[in-house]
């Protein structure tokens, strides 16, 4: 079983407090009926951290180095 930690997510987000907020929000979305974006047989919080580490979920204020949001032209 692969382990996921907040440190795994820090490389993508950079702020541990934001990671926790993102994970909590994602767990609430699961409970509202949203489907997970990664395959996981773990608890909801671990699945949320896996999504963050895989950059399937990004913070709303996320911008690239050029100041644009990913995917915006």
Curated annotation (Swiss-Prot):
Catalysis: reaction(s): RNA(n) + a ribonucleoside 5'-triphosphate = RNA(n+1) + diphosphate
A Pfam family: RNA_pol_Rpb6
Broad EC category: transferase
Example GO BP: DNA-templated transcription
GO CC, any one term: DNA-directed RNA polymerase complex
InterPro entries referenced in this protein's UniProt entry, alphabetically: DNA-dir_RNA_pol_omega, Pol_omega/Rpo6/RPB6, RPB6/omega-like_sf
Assembly notes: The RNAP catalytic core consists of 2 alpha, 1 beta, 1 beta' and 1 omega subunit. When a sigma factor is associated with the core the holoenzyme is formed, which can initiate transcription.
Native source organism of the sequence: Maridesulfovibrio salexigens (strain ATCC 14822 / DSM 2638 / NCIMB 8403 / VKM B-1763)
Family note: Belongs to the RNA polymerase subunit omega family.
Protein function: Promotes RNA polymerase assembly. Latches the N- and C-terminal regions of the beta' subunit thereby facilitating its interaction with the beta and alpha subunits.
Gene behind the chain: rpoZ
HAMAP family linked: RNApol_bact_RpoZ
EC number: 2.7.7.6
Disulfide cysteine pairs (residue numbers): none
Superkingdom: Bacteria
High-level lineage: Bacteria, Pseudomonadati, Thermodesulfobacteriota, Desulfovibrionia, Desulfovibrionales
Record protein name field: DNA-directed RNA polymerase subunit omega
Keywords of the record: DNA-directed RNA polymerase, Nucleotidyltransferase, Transcription, Transferase
Gene Ontology MF terms in the entry: DNA binding; DNA-directed RNA polymerase activity
């Amino acid at each position: 079983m692969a382990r996921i930690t907040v440190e795994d997510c820090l490389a993508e987000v950079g702020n541990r407090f934001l990671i926790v907020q993102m994970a909590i929000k994602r767990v609430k979305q699961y409970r509202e009926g949203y489907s997970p974006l990664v395959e996981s047989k773990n608890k909801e919080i671990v699945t949320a951290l896996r999504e963050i580490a895989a950059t399937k979920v990004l913070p709303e204020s996320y911008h690239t180095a050029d100041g644009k949001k990913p995917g915006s032209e």
